[in-house]
Structure formats: C-alpha cells, structure tokens
Amino acid sequence: MAQRAFPNPYADYNKSLAENYFDSTGRLTPEFSHRLTNKIRELLQQMERGLKSADPRDGTGYTGWAGIAVLYLHLHNVFGDPAYLQMAHSYVKQSLNCLSRRSITFLCGDAGPLAVAAVLYHKMNSEKQAEECITRLIHLNKIDPHVPNEMLYGRIGYIFALLFVNKNFGEEKIPQSHIQQICENILTSGENLSRKRNLAAKSPLMYEWYQEYYVGAAHGLAGIYYYLMQPSLQVNQGKLHSLVKPSVDFVCRLKFPSGNYPPCLDDTRDLLVHWCHGAPGVIYMLIQAYKVFKEERYLCDAQQCADVIWQYGLLKKGYGLCHGAAGNAYAFLALYNLTQDLKYLYRACKFAEWCLDYGEHGCRTADTPFSLFEGMAGTIYFLADLLVPTKAKFPAFEL
C-alpha cells in the first residue's frame, strides 16, 4: 500500500485544527467554502480546454461525454446556475450520438447517456423527449441475457441507471416490477455460481467477472451486495438473511490485518486502496450492512476502512474518483453521514485540501485526464459535493 500512496502529511482530527474548515455543527466556514468554489471554477476552465482533445466517440459516463454531463447536472443542483444545465444538455447530446448497443450500464454502457438525457429533458420541461429516453432505457434489458452482474458492465450498473431516473423524477418512472425482475436475476445468478463452484457453504452468493472473483465496488462482491441491501430493491427479509448477509460476512472474513481488502478472492497482496479495489469501495457495503442488520461489527470494520484510507489514500495515481484522492475522500463523507463524527468530515476536508493543489504532487496522468471517473471532472464533482457534506454521495454509485 505504502509504495502506491504519498505519505499523509496531515495531522489527524482535533477540534482546534478543524475550526479552519467547519464549525461545531459541521457547517463549512465561509473561507473554506470560498477556496473550494474558486478551485471548482479554475478546474472547470482547465477541463473545458482539455476536453477539446478528448475522444469524440466516447459517450460513456466513466470516461466520456455522459460523465461530463453528470458533472454539470450536479453543478446545477449545487449552485442553481442555469448555464450549467445548458452545458449538461450539450454534452448529453454528444453522448447520445455514441451509443454502442452493447453494454447496458450507467458508467460504461448506453444506460448512462439515456438516463442522464431523460433527467435533463425532464428538468428542461421536454417531457416527450424524456419519455423516449426512458422507453429506450427499459428496452436495454433485452440486449444480452448473459450480461454479468457487477457495477461497471453488469446488471447492478443497469439498476443504478433505473434508480437514478426514479430519484430525479421523484416518482416511479421505471416500474418497480422491472427493477425487481433484474434483482431476482442477480440473486439467481449468484446462487447458481456459488453452487456450481462448491462455495455455497461459505457464501450462498458468488459472482465473477472474466473468470475472476472480484471483491471490490467496481467489479465485485462488495458493490453487488451494497445494492442488494438497498431498500429500493425490495429484497425480502428471508433472502436478505439467508443469502445476502452470510455472503457479506464472507467478504468481511477476507479483511487483511491492515483493515484493507483484496481485489480478488485469491489475491494475498495488500496493495490497493481504491474505490474500485479495496477498502474505499468495501466501506459502502459495510455501512449498508450496519444500517440493515444493526450489528456493531460492520461499523467497526467500516471505521477500520476509514483508518486505512486516511493512512494510504493519497494515491500516486491521482485525484480522481475510481482510483484517486477524491474517490477515497467519499468514504469519509459516507461514514460522517452515518455517524455524525466530525473526525470523518475533517478527513474529507484534508483530502479536499490535497485536491486543491491539483497537479502539484507529481501524480500519474490518467489516460482520460478530464473524465468523470479517471480525471479532473470527478475531482470537481467531489469539491462541489463537499460544500454541503450531508448531501454528498459518490457519483454513479452511492444511493
């Protein structure tokens, strides 16, 4: 872990240090809010210049135009500036010209552009166009019966797109029956694979992606179980306790002595502290397990995740969401919003402070340096989210 991160130069939380960032109720100071807002404006200008040389054919949420539309939609929600809505609209139009008709997910497939477009058209009172996008989104489910189950390329990534639409419309535009049918497919698929590989005694559910049993949020078990425990998926209590809970407990037993988690079942190397692989993604599963099953050990494991991230989360890979400081900081915000412990808000603010010096630490440049999940757009999204910490949610993942 240590060789992949910069040593954390910051002192951990105490009340007097925290006064530079927020008051005793967790409200950010005007000075710190001003620093965040100024940096957002500065990075937006850099990003817009950089996007002129981005791949015109990449419409995805992860590295392409839909991701930039998601950022501007978020900025409109935070700041209320209608210009941001217009920017989101122009980028989502580009993304709709790039649909692949292959992958169905929010981040790496056609569901992202269609879901974001539906929400944008709704906000702009173009209801006919919004309905067209929703119809196309629902029909995506028919593309591939052998689709995997994980977040980036699988059924969970499709479910996020459906829930994203319903949340932003404030009503059930996507029928609950459609969502539950996909959820049942995920459960059945997990039971079948677990039995097939003789793992049912250890974990009643099991999932693979390209013949690997991934553990983390992006491709693996933690991301899938985080969703299966969501109230909006309406998994019944019997299945939650007989299938999901023992499978979550199986992931918990994979924990390294450090408090981190492996990227795959058979990987004994304690290296990766990313949202995609490791504690920064597993923490969401643990928090949700604590909310649903009310067992203290899940909270203890989540707090251990946060300690690992504090020590090893300022990554040399950069400042992004998938494997960078901004994505890792969201883990602190999730734990802060669960516990109201100001220590975690402080840690998020310190990681934001690291991001305020964007480009000055000698980090690796991402393949798509201005994108939502690998690059600058994701960092901007995080800095804007931090302005109202109680509303902050990891984009395209956290519900």
UniProtKB/Swiss-Prot annotation:
Residues noted as binding Zn(2+) in the record, renumbered to the chain? 276, 322-323
Q: Which keywords appear in this protein's UniProt record, sorted alphabetically?
A: Acetylation, Cell membrane, Cytoplasm, Membrane, Metal-binding, Transferase, Zinc
User: Which membrane topology term applies here?
Assistant: Peripheral membrane protein
The answer to keyword Zinc applying to this record is yes
Tissues where the protein occurs: Detected in spinal cord (at protein level). Ubiquitous. Strongly expressed in brain, testis, alveolar macrophages and epithelial cells of the lung, kidney and intestine. Expression in brain increases during the first postnatal month and remaining high in adult.
**Entries under InterPro entries matching the protein:** 6hp_glycosidase-like_sf (IPR012341), LANC-like (IPR007822), LanC-like_prot_euk (IPR020464)
Q: Which SUPFAM superfamilies match?
A: LanC-like
Q: What's the domain of life for this entry?
A: Eukaryota
Assembly notes: Interacts with the C-terminal of STOM. Interacts with the EPS8 SH3 domain. Interaction with EPS8 is inhibited by glutathione binding.
- What is this protein called in UniProt? Glutathione S-transferase LANCL1
Organism, by scientific name, is: Mus musculus
